[in-house]
A protein has these predicted regions:
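Solvent-exposed loop/turn segments at secondary-structure junctions
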Residues: 30-32, 55-59, 85-87, 110-113, ...
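Catalytic-core regions built around general acid/base machinery
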Residues: 97-100, 121-134
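Glycine/threonine-rich flexible loop motifs
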Residues: 111-121
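Bacterial Sec-dependent N-terminal signal peptides
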Residues: 1-20
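C-terminal and late-domain segments of enzyme folds
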Residues: 19-46, 61-66, 70-73, 103, ...
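Short internal beta-strands
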Residues: 51-55, 173-174
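Catalytic nucleophile loop
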Residues: 105-108, 127-150
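Portal/gating segments that form or line small-molecule/metal binding sites
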Residues: 57-109, 113
């Protein structure tokens, strides 16, 4: 019996040790050179393969060119995953492409349309598999909102609304927290009425690192941008400014 218990203990220990640490880095605005550098650092690789997903911007060529311009001079191997493809020319599945990367960065745009395409193409399943493998996931705007349970979006006509995400992170989210004046009030309102759960909000130049689905640290590209933890307590909304590390 003692040997059996020891076996179970060792089996559980090595199984836990073999699981990759899951890293997810979100920021409130668009992709920048600074955020790419930080994502690259999270991989632990000297020259990481980083794949950009411009789905939310309909694979816009100017956005793709901007991505390559940002990566120029950085010690990274830049890739792009396009969804507007033909089987005549693309011979690898989306999953095959993504699983070979060290990091994946999702761009901004229309979150609702992006998620619909991902689900139709099973890219959402490939991203979950990549995340569980330990491939670093990152993104801003639509590219940050998508990872959360739900949050504020401009993906529908007329006004901001609430959208459900992939639920990799079991919190709500608000990007563009102070740069778009209607974001913060809408976020407060929906946390107060419990349409949204507690969650994290980011200014455009601020980001948050989650390790194994939990908050790890807040970073910023300047001293004026911050991230916040927002929740309901005693019938009121509480906003906690997170201690932030400036990155270059």
């Amino acid at each position: 019996m003692k040997h059996f218990i020891l076996f179970l203990f060792l089996f559980s220990y090595f199984q836990a040790s073999s699981q990759s640490e899951r890293k997810l880095f979100v920021y409130g605005g668009q992709v920048t050179k600074g955020f790419i550098k930080y994502t690259a650092k999270l991989t632990g690789k000297k020259k990481p393969k980083i794949c950009f997903l411009p789905t939310a911007n309909a694979d816009d060529i100017y956005y793709i060119n901007y991505w390559h311009k940002l990566c120029a001079g950085l010690n990274v191997e830049a890739h792009v995953l396009r969804v507007w493809i033909s089987s005549r020319y693309q011979k690898k599945s989306f999953e095959e492409i993504l699983m070979k990367m060290d990091a994946i960065i999702v761009g901004g745009g229309n979150t609702l349309n992006m998620l619909a395409i991902w689900k139709a193409q099973e890219i959402d399943l490939a991203l979950k598999k990549a995340y569980d493998k330990g491939i670093v996931l990152a993104g801003g705007s639509a590219g940050s909102l998508c990872w959360f349970k739900a949050g504020t979006t401009d993906s529908r006509p007329k006004k901001l609304s609430i959208i459900k995400g992939l639920e990799f992170l079991n919190y709500s989210h608000c990007p563009h927290y102070h740069s778009e004046k209607t974001r913060r009030p809408l976020y407060f309102k929906n946390i107060l009425n419990e349409t949204l759960s507690d969650g994290y909000a980011c200014d455009d130049k601020s980001g948050i690192l989650f390790l194994n689905n939990r908050f790890s640290k807040s970073v910023s590209l300047n001293a004026k941008s911050f991230s916040y933890y927002v929740y309901k307590k005693d019938g009121k909304v509480v906003e906690e400014k997170l201690k932030t590390e400036i990155i270059k």
